Amino acid sequence: RFRRLCPKVDVDLRMVDHALEPFELLQSGKTDVIFASRQKEPKCEWIPLYHELLYAILPKQYPLNGRKEFPLREFEGKDFLMPYGRFDIDVHAAFAKEGVRAKEQSVYVDDETVIRMVGKGLGISMMSELMIRGNTDDVLCIPVTPKSIRELGMGTEKGVELSESVRRLKECVVEYTSCLHGRTF
């Protein structure tokens, strides 16, 4: 839709190495718009777009005993494979609410590899629903309790008048995401 509304506007999409990098790029003027997970105090105009649950990623043989949720406290003392890319910010926020201290191992591999490592019994992990979609054949993925969410959104520079093309992009994204079925808590 945006391409139809603004056919002469180039959109440059970038992957970043960690969760704080989009905010750094925005603050340094290297980008006009970011899509990211909300951080404690985003120093930008922030528009919430989607809320996603955090899930425990467990080996298939993990003894759940019929439970449909995984208590955050059960991560305590367990070998925990920490996903790469500063996702630890979201994990630590969830752990802090319950005072959990897992035996964290930082792993510098992609999410799919972390899931495979869990499937091989090398530890357990926690990821958001968008991180695990389609990669769950060898593991159990169940929501953590108490419910923990991560807010995805769009940011623009604070206090700056948006260009016509950025304003239109913002409108298109808000309209598109309004029909997604994110979580409301």
Language-model-detected regions and their locations in the chain:
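Short secondary-structure boundary segments
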Residues: 37-39, 60, 128-131, 152, ...
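Short beta-strand->loop
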Residues: 45-55, 106, 125, 129-130, ...
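Secondary-structure junction motif
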Residues: 64, 78-99, 162-170, 180-185
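Short secondary-structure boundary/capping segments
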Residues: 3, 45-48, 64, 71-73, ...
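A late-sequence structural motif
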Residues: 140-185
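Central regulatory/effector-binding core of bacterial HTH transcription factors
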Residues: 1-41, 108
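Hydrophobic hinge/microswitch elements
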Residues: 17-30, 86-140
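Flexible hinge/capping segments at coil-to-helix
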Residues: 43-54, 58-80, 163-164
